Amino acid sequence: MKRHIFNTFILGFAIASCTDPFMGQTATDHVAPGPIKNAKVINLEGSALITYDLPEDEDLLYIKATYQRNKDVIAQNKASVYTDTLTIVGLGDTLARDVEVVAVDRSGNMSEAVQVTIHPKTPPIKTVFKSLSVEPALS
């Protein structure tokens, strides 16, 4: 009798372990979050800092910025919901770029895009390169 109870117990565990538990966030709604407000740009050397006010949304997950790094590359930067700044880095020139900033919630819904224009200053590598001088060392 004990053997039948034990076998039934083991069989129950085997059946229960065959199902895969759901991992991840389920889609909770189809309502997009509000757009960011008061977007301001601080242009830095080879980069830019965008500050903003977060929208009031309970399931806001992150803020995403999309911009064209050069002719061939479209880049994205993301910032956590726990900060109000987004940094765009790695810009090798001083050309103006349009950045599209959207808020994304846990369901993947995106807000209306807010367009900001950044004008990065001269990158540090170009400033240092201009000041370098190459001279022979030993001869």
Task: List PLM regions with ranges.
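Pro/Thr/Ser/Gly-rich low-complexity, intrinsically disordered linker/stalk tracts
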Residues: 19-59, 112-139
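Beta-strand-rich modules
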Residues: 86-114
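Sec-dependent signal peptide recognition
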Residues: 2-10
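Surface-exposed coil/turn segments at beta-strand junctions on protein surfaces, enriched
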Residues: 43, 79-81, 90-94, 133
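Extracellular low-complexity, O-glycosylation-prone stalks/linkers
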Residues: 54-78, 82
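C-terminal motif of bacterial Sec signal peptides marking the signal peptidase cleavage site
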Residues: 14-17
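Beta-strand-rich interaction surfaces with strong enrichment in secreted/lumenal proteins
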Residues: 38-39, 75-78, 87-89
